């Protein structure tokens, strides 16, 4: 299935007026927060294939293309919400719960609460809204793809800020993922306050 608005249309048919796409980034990282975004577009824009051309799963775009597309999304969206959950809370409550909290906070941070949600993978039963949860939603739904771009750009920028504060770990390069560079930094310096010490790969570096 190519990316489009099929999922949004399903929610419209079920009575939703405002539909937001929701996605997260950073779930599999060894360090840093998990970040979620919720994005809603005016209905007339969702029905205009030209207006939202180029929006796609953030993983398919270069860093430069994501930054440019994030600017376009901010200009066109009727609402954008963000949710950020720290490594400390991830360690306390687990990545699954942390991801849900980030997504719920993103939805509740929207300027207008939507009637329906298209969510990548996760279900949010705590929110009494119409929902469609689907695998690889960021490759299917324009709204979810937009959320994936906003979340990715926000988190990448945050990791760049962390890198400026403490360049020892190379946050700007690997964004907290378990690359060889990251593993070498962990071996040399040990875990930082940004590391998810509950994650199994960190066990070798935690006293």
Swiss-Prot record:
Catalyzed reactions per annotation: Endonucleolytic cleavage to 5'-phosphomonoester
Gene Ontology CC: cytoplasm; ribonuclease H2 complex
Cofactor note: Manganese or magnesium. Binds 1 divalent metal ion per monomer in the absence of substrate. May bind a second metal ion after substrate binding.
Gene3D superfamilies, sorted: Ribonuclease H-like superfamily/Ribonuclease H
Cofactor(s) listed in the protein's UniProt record: Mn(2+); Mg(2+)
Annotated keywords: Cytoplasm, Endonuclease, Hydrolase, Manganese, Metal-binding, Nuclease
InterPro entries reported for this sequence: RNase_HII (IPR022898), RNase_HII/HIII (IPR001352), RNase_HII/HIII_dom (IPR024567), RNaseH-like_sf (IPR012337), RNaseH_sf (IPR036397)
Ranges for domain RNase H type-2: 17-207
Pfam families, sorted: RNase_HII
Enzyme superclass (EC): hydrolase
This protein's record includes keyword Nuclease: yes
Subcellular location field: Cytoplasm
Main location group: cytoplasm
Highest rank taxon of the organism: Bacteria
EC number: 3.1.26.4
One GO-annotated biological process of the protein: mismatch repair
Transmembrane found in the keyword field: no
Residue positions binding a divalent metal cation: 23-24, 120
Molecular function in Gene Ontology: manganese ion binding; RNA binding; RNA-DNA hybrid ribonuclease activity
Sequence similarity: Belongs to the RNase HII family.
HAMAP family in the cross-refs: RNase_HII_B
Function per UniProt: Endonuclease that specifically degrades the RNA of RNA-DNA hybrids.
This protein's name: Ribonuclease HII
